[in-house]
Amino acid sequence: MAEDSESAASQQSLELDDQDTCGIDGDNEEENEHMQGSPGGDLGAKKKKKKQKRKKEKPSSGGTKSDSASDSQEIKNPAIPMQKLQDIQRAMELLSTCQGPAKNIDEATKHKYQFWDTQPVPKLNEVVTTHGPIEPDKENIRQEPYSLPQGFMWDTLDLSNAEVLKELYTLLNENYVEDDDNMFRFDYSPNFLKWALRPPGWLPHWHCGVRVSSNKKLVGFISAIPADIHIYDTLKRMVEINFLCVHKKLRSKRVAPVLIREITRRVNLEGIFQAVYTAGVVLPKPVSTCRYWHRSLNPRKLVEVKFSHLSRNMTLQRTMKLYRLPDSTRTPGLRTMGDRDVKQVTALLQKHLSQFHLRPVMGEEEVKHWFLPQENIIDTFVVEGSGGMLTDFISFYTLPSTVMHHPLHKSLKAAYSFYNVHTETPLIDLMNDALILAKLKGFDVFNALDLMDNKNFLEKLKFGIGDGNLQYYLYNWKCPPMDPEKVGLVLQ
């Protein structure tokens, strides 16, 4: 946002009156940036957090405890009542514990969730044993968009327009999810965005943007796509919320809350009142918590960009040998999925997913969209047995990350495990072939969550555990929490 007019607009306060604003968390806009259906904030594997340097405190001349300074200050400043000082101290302690989004349950219990406390979601400390909506479906839904402050405007993004698609790509590429050390940022390609945002049943007004009125620069975005989701024994028409992004120069200016409220209004107008989403931070209240695992395919590059590090007593050469893969796959009948396979893949997928508590329901149109291979977007391979019968399939999608601040490497090509079904071939053999195929296609790392059956192969195939979780959430629906192996839903 370099232009003068744009900079001026960005300085305007986005604080709206109560009737026109909302927030995922009214205290922390950064938390809002982490609410997404994408693979969380765990872009780096097993990286240690940078230690904050602390200045050493000089001992007092009297050899008393370090907090004696505050005691003496109370004596030296009789105009400040002790109660006031204690209030200030408590406020400072509260600030120190609540700065930044909560990464785990312990941090979350100390966090204030002003927005979520008003929303139809379970409280963090609530023990949920029932199933069903938290609020009934609304009958009277606001017809007009929520108001934005002067200088900003709503815009429904037409992703069939190449220029608009490029604008969205640029916004996400420069402002979307980064790892904790600001070394990697997701790099969704324009064609990937069209794939992720235009499945069967998509609606154009669910691609919700915010622009600067003066120069029409895109500075905010949120999306919803329709999905039929099974939650335990209940089938609900929902939306998947994804790609919530606000320009960095507008952070802490209450843009994300308005985006959330507006997409909720637009979804409600279509008669849908439940949503599913994922986040790398802890909000009230996760229905499940999964962990990312990473399998090195190009160890040299991963070490050079500090995505991973050499283990103790391991040289680079030994590490490369450890992760070396065969040059060809081993499963007989393994081939690329084609149009003729859609019907059988749909049947395999539906039967496989029926064992999980949280799962999508996909017909042939959805399977055709999500699984038919597209270069640098989605790869699917099927195993064809005798008589043309399909027995298994594997799939993974492509999501590179921009490597920041590195003189040589600018991008990290990552494969993300999507849906894998096995009936004849052992899962570990299928996934080993998936690693080989990804390596042959030039991927640097293969990522997988520990959901569905994935725990059966992660350690055996030399995946390393990542340093972040991915929480699954339901909006306006309560149900008992579930273990990762009962989650059968993967969001981009």
From Swiss-Prot:
Reaction(s) catalysed by this chain's protein: N-terminal glycyl-[protein] + tetradecanoyl-CoA = N-tetradecanoylglycyl-[protein] + CoA + H(+); N-terminal glycyl-L-lysyl-[protein] + tetradecanoyl-CoA = N-terminal glycyl-(N(6)-tetradecanoyl)-L-lysyl-[protein] + CoA + H(+)
List of residues binding tetradecanoyl-CoA: H111, W116, L244, V246, S252, R254, V255, A256
PROSITE patterns for the chain: NMT_1 (PS00975), NMT_2 (PS00976)
E.C. number(s) listed in UniProt: 2.3.1.97
This protein's GO CC annotations: cytosol; membrane
Keyword presence, Cytoplasm: yes
Region (Disordered): 1-77
Molecular function terms from GO: glycylpeptide N-tetradecanoyltransferase activity; peptidyl-lysine N6-myristoyltransferase activity
Acidic residues bias spans: 15-32
Biased composition (Polar residues): 61-72
EC primary class: transferase
GO BP of this protein: N-terminal peptidyl-glycine N-myristoylation; protein localization to membrane
Topological relation to the membrane, as annotated: Peripheral membrane protein
Signal sequence interval, chain numbering: none
Biased composition (Basic residues): 46-57
Record's keyword terms, sorted: Acyltransferase, Cytoplasm, Membrane, Transferase
Protein name in the entry: Glycylpeptide N-tetradecanoyltransferase 2
